[in-house]
């Protein structure tokens, strides 16, 4: 729906939805279009360079469509910035205490880099990569503290390990008194209705299934190399 249009500037939003359910589509279409209408900016953070490249490609395609639709140049990059967590971590490690200029203000006290929304895509990254990347804690603290007063949107299909930490760290603000921040959670259940489940006793049953469904593509995993080679040989024959 359009509930996102009522998110206040210091709202905390958690979106839990399976991969492929349209989380990034919502940001790049619904939220971005609304942000452009309102003159607001989005900082979109991702955990992998390949994902960043895909999002940039989608944005450029969207620019082309909007230019054709409205007959004028649409400066989409005035309204969205896409970064990886690792880019920020690298700058922090090199001594740049504020790589996004989030805490620098102009003479009127306004941030020189002003964002209304900060999107943490695949936010389980802060937990999943922490065992081998100490930079995750550095970037998490910098980002969440620097953007306490904007809409922070955390998205993941596996957000369970981060959800309690996010709530504990961010659902309050400190001023003259302690008060809770607005908190929103949206959850989409995983639908496995499309899965056709079979229990297989041995390789012969797999071969019979393949023979009866000749037009289907098969991806087979095995925990034994010898059995896997034997099955591959039987399939070829």
For each of these PLM feature ranges, what is it?
Residues 9-29:
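Walker A/P-loop
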Residues 159-210:
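Interdomain hinge/linker at the junction between the two RecA-like core domains of SF2 helicases
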Residues 25-70:
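Conserved P-loop
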Residues 44, 81-84, 119, 150-157:
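Structural recognition of the conserved hydrophobic beta-strand(s) that form the central parallel beta-sheet
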């Amino acid at each position: 729906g359009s509930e996102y249009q009522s998110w206040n500037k210091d709202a905390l939003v958690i979106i839990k939805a399976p991969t492929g359910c349209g989380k990034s589509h919502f940001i790049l279409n619904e939220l971005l279009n609304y942000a452009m209408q309102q003159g607001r900016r989005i900082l979109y953070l991702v955990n992998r360079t390949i994902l960043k490249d895909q999002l940039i490609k989608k944005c450029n395609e969207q620019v082309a469509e909007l230019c054709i639709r409205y007959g004028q140049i649409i400066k989409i990059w005035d309204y969205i910035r896409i970064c990886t967590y690792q880019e920020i971590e690298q700058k922090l490690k090199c001594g740049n205490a504020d790589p996004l200029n989030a805490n620098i203000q102009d003479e009127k006290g306004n941030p020189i880099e002003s964002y209304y929304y900060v999107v943490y895509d695949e936010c389980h990254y802060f937990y999943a990569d922490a065992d081998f990347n100490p930079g995750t804690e550095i970037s998490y603290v910098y980002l969440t503290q620097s953007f306490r007063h904007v809409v922070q949107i955390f998205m993941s299909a596996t957000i369970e390990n981060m959800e309690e930490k996010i709530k504990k760290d961010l659902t309050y603000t400190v001023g003259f008194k302690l008060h809770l921040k607005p908190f929103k959670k949206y959850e989409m259940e995983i639908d496995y209705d499309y899965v056709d489940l079979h229990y297989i006793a041995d390789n012969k049953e797999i071969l019979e299934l393949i023979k009866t469904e000749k037009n289907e593509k098969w991806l087979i995993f095995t925990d034994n190399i010898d059995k896997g080679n034997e099955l591959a040989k039987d399939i070829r024959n």
